[in-house]
Amino acid sequence: PBKALITGFWSKVKVBZVGAZALGRLLVVYPWTZRFFZHFGBLSSABAVMBBAKVKAHGKKVLBSFSBGLKHLBBLKGAFASLSZLHCBKLHVBPZBFRLLGBVLVVVLARHFGKZFBPZLZAZFZKVVAGVASALAHRYH
């Protein structure tokens, strides 16, 4: 991946807004992913999910970790080792969910940035989200 392009763009991302929307959309578009978040409360409708304070807070937490990972593009497996262990060994998250979240994140970035999120930038982010998803699923291999 083009580190300079990725980090330069990422500095413009409002992690709290994008994270909240990405996680919310994941839960709405792929409702089976809600099983890990049932304790958050009412997730019975798209509006309930998108307005849920716990979903928003966890979405920010997810993207804060993603931001940290961008500082280690040469060692994503190392950067996400402890989160891989948590999500795989303790929470038993389906590794496919990491790929789905990456796909949703790309959609949200395109929505927020429009023409600025051009095909070249999208291609770079597709590589990054695939790398992060692979790193998070590493404990399954």
Swiss-Prot record:
- Keyword set, alphabetical order: Heme, Iron, Metal-binding, Oxygen transport, Transport
InterPro entries, per database record? Globin, Globin-like_sf, Globin/Proto, Hemoglobin_b, Hemoglobin_oxygen_transport
Superkingdom of the organism of origin: Eukaryota
Any GO MF annotation of the entry: oxygen binding
| Tissue expression per record | Red blood cells.
What PROSITE patterns does the record tag this protein with?
A: GLOBIN (PS01033)
What CDD domains does the record point to?
Answer: Hb-beta-like
Q: Name one GO cellular component term.
A: hemoglobin complex
A Gene Ontology BP annotation from the UniProt entry: hydrogen peroxide catabolic process
Q: Which residues bind heme b?
A: 58, 87
Disulphide bridges, residue numbers: none
| Something else known | This type of beta C chain is found in non-anemic barbary sheep, whereas the other type of beta C chain is found in anemic barbary sheep.
Sequence similarity? Belongs to the globin family.
Quaternary assembly: Heterotetramer of two alpha chains and two beta chains.
What this chain does, per the entry, is described as: Involved in oxygen transport from the lung to the various peripheral tissues.
| Name this polypeptide is given | Hemoglobin subunit beta-C(NA)
Q: Which organism is it from?
A: Ammotragus lervia
